[in-house]
A protein has these predicted regions:
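Hydrophobic faces of well-ordered beta-strands that scaffold small-molecule active sites
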Residues: 1, 22-26, 46-52, 70-72, ...
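Active-site mouth loops of central-metabolism enzymes
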Residues: 1-8, 27-29, 46-54, 80-81, ...
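N-terminal active-site wall of soluble small-molecule enzyme domains
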Residues: 8-16, 24-65
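Alpha-helix-loop-beta-strand connector modules within alpha/beta enzyme cores
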Residues: 31-52, 89-103, 164-178
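Hydrophobic or amphipathic alpha-helical targeting/insertion segments
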Residues: 46, 54-104
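Catalytic alpha/beta core domains of metabolic enzymes, predominantly
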Residues: 113, 118-187
Length: 187
């Protein structure tokens, strides 16, 4: 269900809550969806997590709508400028709002979003590249005072996902969200 369809989304959330679900993540793919988050959050029987991709302004909209948890993939939000220098404005603005709202953040890194310099260093989205990316992004948040962080590392390779999370657990005390990306059978 598209999150834009508030009625259908709330029906799904209600069914999940009736069956014991305690928290629901909803996709926030665009501004149109972002404009409906206040209504969705207000009517939801359980806390919601805003799943943000590509545009940090969607995360700001979610926080303004009362969401207290975000899932972001900084590799998709942070971009380099023409001089190949990282533009930190998105993370600066977002961190300030996260702190003001006392929100938590799940930093999600996956094999499709590993930064070019790490791909060059490791040759492919290896477990080491995934972990270095995740630690880089948690550091961006920590440097700005954000500490309510959990980390998710996923690869289309189950073995790489396991290796990356084992390596991550040796390097940080942040909670780890375990999951599989690109789940399901091929069509």
């Amino acid at each position: 269900t598209s999150t834009k369809n508030i009625k259908a989304t709330l029906e799904q959330i209600d069914k999940l809550a009736e069956n014991g679900c305690e928290i629901v993540r909803v996709a926030v793919p665009d501004m149109e969806t972002g404009k409906k988050l206040s209504e969705l959050n207000r009517q939801s029987p359980v806390p919601l997590v805003a799943d943000i991709h590509f545009d940090y302004r969607l995360a700001l909209m979610a926080l303004d709508a009362g969401f207290t948890a975000l899932r972001i993939n900084p590799g998709n939000i942070l971009k380099k400028n023409e001089q190949d220098i990282l533009d930190t404005k998105p993370i600066d603005v977002l961190a300030k709002q996260i702190l003001a709202c006392d929100a938590s953040v799940r930093v999600g890194v996956n094999s499709g979003s590993v930064e070019k310099d790490l791909l060059d260093k490791y040759g492919h989205p290896s477990p080491e590249a995934l972990v270095e990316s995740a630690l880089r992004h948690t550091a961006y948040l920590e440097e700005r005072g954000v500490t309510q962080i959990k980390v998710s590392i996923k690869s289309s390779s189950v073995i790489d996902t396991i290796k990356a999370n084992m390596l991550l657990s040796e390097k940080t005390d942040y909670p780890i969200h375990l999951g599989v990306t690109e789940a399901g059978t091929p069509i």
